[in-house]
Amino acid sequence: MPPPQHPPNYYAPRRSISTITGPNRRDVDAFYQNNFPEKNGGSSGEHVPEYQASGQQHRPSIMSGQSHQNNHLPTKNYSYEPLRFSPPNVTPPPLQFSTNTDGNRKNQRVRFNELPNYSTPNHYSVPPRKCSLAPNFFSSQNSHHMYPDQYTPRTWQNNEFMPNHQVHPYHANHQQQHPQQHWRNQAASNGNHNPMYMRKHSAGHGIEIKLDHVDNPFGNPSHDMMDVTSGQPVKSEMLSPIKMETTDPSQQIASPSFLMTSTSLLKQHLHKKSHHNVPSRKASIMALKSQLRTPRGTPLNISTVPGTELPYTPPPILAPMRNGSGLFCQIVKSANSSLPVAEQSPDAPSCSTNGVDGDMKHLMNGKKRSEDGDGPSRKNGFFYMAQQMNQTNFANELEALRKESWASTSSADEKMQTERKESLESIRKASCMSDSYYEIEEGPKISDPNPHINLGKNYQARVKKWCDRQVSTSERDAIEDRDEIVFSSEILQDIDPEQITAFELLACSQACPRAGRNKELALHLLMENKGNIEAAVEDLLRSDTLDWEHYSSVFGYMYNDSVLWTPDEIYQFQDAIYQSEKDFDKVAVELPGKSVKECVQFYYTWKKDCPDDYRKLRNLRRKRQLLDINLQKNQSEEPVVPAKKISIIESGDSDNESNATDSSFIGNGHMEFRDRAFTSPMMSSPREEPIIGLSPSSKDLFGIQKNYQPTAPRAHHTPSASASKKGAQPSADGFFHCRLCDKCFEKVKSLNAHMKSHAMKARAEQEAKAHDAQVAAAAAAQLTSAVGNVVGNPVATSPLNSFANGHLGISIPSTIGNLTPQQLTPQQLNLNQQLQTQLNSLSNQMSLNSPLTPQQQLQQFTQQHLMARAMQQNLFQPVTSTPLVQPTHPLIQAGLHSIN
């Protein structure tokens, strides 16, 4: 059979698995132009020609939008809306059967000219949509399930643009009564080409509808059609939205149970409401909001009693008895899979997607199986019901369909194309025209969206009774009452308020020997003595020797400040709290006899009773925070130079000192030079010993130096440390310490005023320093003249020489001058040359009459001292980087102090 022919202006819409559209206006116009040219031309008065032969009749296209009716589907009225994406709406009346048989089946046609021609209102238009996942043709507005496995378009409710006689007569909102219609069933004959039809007998219009014919592909289950694109034969049971049964259609019509089923299902759908301008859930998956708050179910999983209110499930919890998958769906399926099918609870949360058909059957592995097939109910975002596709290879075809949808963007295997037994286009058409294309929530509501308290044993906790019996009154009375009255104000009614005040003051005074004196203890004792204030006073005064076990309210109770603290412990606590900044673990370490809890408790008492000390702690914390901030800034800007190095650098002019000044001579242990070249006068004071071997001039010089020795130290407290910092900074303890004395101040202003007194002392010290420098210069001149005599006469003729280097504390052996160069070793010759060179340089310097500073004089004196030492030991030590050590001779000490 050749494929149906289309007019030249007919364009089949493009369809794929991702975008499926219904018949548009062009499809509907082409449909009417092809099948009803007289009606489309507006000739309502002309008669439709008689039924044509099967070879001359043009069959309507599959996707043209023509309503497909079953062989037992009558029609009542005709209404066509060109602005809707839907075919003409055909409303079926309730079925009424009769036994009247008539063999006249010649005029098997629909007389549309006998129907009233209602003009379409032009003042109402629906804006066309450009793209839609599923048009309104598949929405619940136009598809109303009246009978099982049957597709019938549905009209709108209370549509003001539709005549009243086009509304369903069974609708609840319809108020107009229609005339009673009588239907007469005319039995079918046994011939294949003698179809069964129904005739309507009415006082008004007469309609004859052909239901079953050899050329009707939608009414004949055994007839196969040709695909539009491929030309392959397509089974009509795949294309028709009506589920084809293998039984005789006449038996289904004659069955009275069919009417009861239709009526019961019709009542279940009466509660559904729709609007003509709002797409339903079928039209778009994301068109409506979530329905989880008001789920629907089947009578199998409704646990509520009829007549009671629906249970409420508060968000975000989902209703446990809802349809569809959820949080606990896998748990329920795994639990049900471990049990036989007969033992599974019917009240368990359902994971099914079809509530009308009662699809609650589960396999042993926990998966849901369909009623008519075991194919999937959803694939690649679309809902395909296996019960509509009564085939065994439906899953394979659906998988092939999914692979085909990706063929445009990826290289799919061509072998999948050859394995298909049915056309992909036919499957898409069947899915579009199928009534179960999208999942619909069926059945009554099982959850109430309005919040309320759920009543009933199913929603309340089941608490097991105590020992499975009730507690008797005697047993309740036998239970000991653990509540104990500690204090009651009734005992104060018979006591004078002045006595109570005096008693409280006594408890807080030092007359109470027990630690933790407070009013709470006094009131407890008054309660224990039952309001006898005299007995309470006696107990309070002997609280240190009282047996507290007889007082249940006082025994074992920890009162505030009940730990005794001695004054020494309080001082230790203050020092520890100042240093640790409220680190009570460290405070407890400083106080061995106290725990951390006791230290914390005493801290709040000390804070309240000693506000001045607490204010000091608060200032310390604030100053430490500022100090930390300043230290971080200084470290980020430049590295901090240690104060010790600064004092050493600024103590003297290292550029004017020679290498001999920094050398150490390893001889006797008492002549070593140490790190501290300049120490306080308390550590380097001259010893009160007679100096042996000194000349009278040397003794006088020592006496002058002793008398004019500076009293204030200058090397120990150097102003370099204060000059290195910008502004005074608090110490670690939070105080501002004076760098010249041991005084400390809380404020910077106090420290600045104190430093002014040090400045006055510094000026006086500078004047004394200048006077000491003059005296030291005179002493150095005398010393230089004495050394010059030694240089001028280097060879002494006798060890009893009057000078004999006695002022240096060294005796040069006289044998050196009597030795000849041949008798000296090479080492001695080298030493003699070096010493002679140094002595010549010293003599040249002293020959000049230029005045020398005390520091230069001390340098020359030190060199002479080293040369004399080398002559005595007959050894030469290399110059090292070790600084000079304080010598023991008082003259050198005087020179060092004069330099400072």
UniProtKB/Swiss-Prot annotation:
Cellular component terms (Gene Ontology): histone deacetylase complex; nucleus; transcription regulator complex
Compositional bias of kind Basic and acidic residues: 358-377, 412-425
Presence of the UniProt keyword Membrane in the record: no
Polar residues bias (residue ranges): 53-75
Compartment(s) of residence: Nucleus
Tissue expression: Ubiquitously expressed.
Top-level taxonomic group: Eukaryota
Keywords assigned by UniProt, alphabetized: Coiled coil, Metal-binding, Nucleus, Repressor, Transcription, Transcription regulation, Zinc, Zinc-finger
Alphabetical GO biological process terms: negative regulation of DNA-templated transcription; regulation of transcription by RNA polymerase II
Subunit details: May be a component of a histone deacetylase complex containing saeg-2, saeg-1 and hda-2. May interact with egl-4.
Domain ELM2: 451-544
Molecular functions (GO terms): transcription corepressor activity; zinc ion binding
Protein's recorded name: Suppressor of activated egl-4 protein 1
ZnF C2H2-type: positions: 736-758
Region named Disordered: 1-75, 340-380, 406-425, 710-729
Residue ranges of every copy of the SANT domain listed in the record: 560-611
Alphabetized InterPro entries for the sequence: ELM2_dom (IPR000949), Homeodomain-like_sf (IPR009057), SANT/Myb (IPR001005), SANT_dom (IPR017884), Trans_reg/Corepressor (IPR051066), Znf_C2H2_type (IPR013087)
Role this protein plays: As a likely component of a histone deacetylase complex, together with saeg-2 and hda-2, functions downstream of the cAMP-dependent kinase egl-4 to regulate the expression of genes required for egg-laying and foraging.
Substitution effect: H758L: Reduced body size and egg-laying
